[in-house]
Amino acid sequence: YGWMTMRALKEGYVTLEPALLFPFGGKEEIEGPNRQKLDQDLQYLGTSILAVEVYKISRLIDVACERPEVDKDRIAMMGLSYGGCYTLYTAALDTRIKAAVSSCFFNERKRYLWSDWSYFNFMNEFNDAEVCALICPRAFMIEVGDNDTLFAVDGAKAESVRAKKYWDGLGLPDRFNFTAFAG
């Protein structure tokens, strides 16, 4: 992932890398719980794996804020792919996050009806732009790859136009950024 964490460390940031539940790592599957089955079971109980993971990240921020080297007024979050998903949703729910970068996830969610973010009636309530409304007026950046084979760049561009309206409406267009990069 381009050594994101190392680059942040070199710039003087305190970084955290939460351990999240994924059924894969690199090219080989990791043995353990089936993520989709676990998510389905959690949804029967009224929650989801996404909600559990966002809660874990928020608790990690609690712990980090107790450390003297962490300025709790300058918390930022960035993530790539699933990390971009967790960044979008955690920043929407945890207002301690003052700036967030969601890379290679943000899109027109209706194109990707995966169990991780498909809930009863969600299309009538929250697409990615509406989740962004919960981040606004805090700083938010979306990065997408022009050659992403998973999430289409045109969907991300269209959804970002809808999201940007929240910042524009408050006269804060500089706090929202959409970037498509070669890759």
Predicted features by range, described:
Residues 1-66, 109-116:
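Cap/lid segment of the alpha/beta-hydrolase catalytic domain
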Residues 8-10, 134-136, 171-172:
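Extracellular/periplasmic catalytic domains that process cell-envelope and extracellular macromolecules
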Residues 11, 58-124, 128-131:
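Primarily recognizes the serine-hydrolase "nucleophile elbow" in alpha/beta-hydrolase
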Residues 15-18, 76, 99-102, 134, ...:
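Structural recognition of the beta-strand scaffold that forms the well-ordered cores
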Residues 22-23, 82, 107, 147:
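Residue-level marker for beta-strand->alpha-helix junctions and adjacent short loops that shape enzyme
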Residues 44-52, 78, 119-127, 150-154, ...:
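Alpha-helix capping and helix-loop boundary segments enriched in small/acidic/polar residues
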Residues 99, 108-168:
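The feature captures the conserved acid-bearing segment of alpha/beta-hydrolase catalytic domains
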Residues 161-183:
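C-terminal catalytic histidine-bearing segment of alpha/beta-hydrolase fold enzymes
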